[in-house]
Design a protein with these regions (language model features):
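HhH-family (HhH-GPD) DNA N-glycosylase catalytic core used in base-excision repair
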Residues: 1-148
């Protein structure tokens, strides 16, 4: 099922959190510019496509506080691949034990549509490194050479 999206007081709200789990997504090593904002790892802040934003899991909802409908629709709906129905995809391979095991351990993962150059740099930096070191290298590059 695709997440149900609605807008409420400068906050984007997604229902269907099973299809989107922030800590699984941001701690997976797929992206390196998001950091937990609380000890429970239910709120993350980070940069994507030149914008800082926060994502919070609250009960049955995923919140994007201080985000306009325009910013969400023009950039972040695609970034988080929200128009793809991951549940339907998962149901299409019920007999593959390897894939079922991956879904059990990484439920809520999405494929991020990241900027190609940042993805390339992240991949190069990831060789023979761990996630904390990759994050610090990417932050150093962004601070030194990124746009203000």
């Amino acid at each position: 099922m695709k997440p149900n999206v609605f807008f409420e007081n400068d906050t984007v709200v997604l229902r269907a959190p099973r299809a989107f789990t922030p800590n699984v997504l941001f701690e997976s090593g797929q992206c390196f510019r998001f950091y937990p904002k609380n000890e429970e790892k239910t709120r993350y802040g980070g940069v994507a496509h030149g914008h800082y934003f926060e994502v919070e899991l609250r009960g049955e909802e995923i919140l994007f506080p201080n985000m306009t409908e325009k910013a969400f629709s023009s950039t972040f709906r695609d970034y988080f691949d929200l128009d793809f129905d991951y549940d339907a995809c998962i149901l299409s391979f019920p007999k593959d034990e390897y894939l079922r095991s991956a879904v059990r351990s990484c439920g809520g993962m999405r494929i991020l549509h990241q900027e190609p150059f940042e993805t390339l740099c992240s991949f190069i930096l990831s060789q023979n490194n761990n996630i904390p070191r990759i994050r610090s290298l990417i932050e150093a590059l962004c601070a030194a050479y990124g746009e203000p």
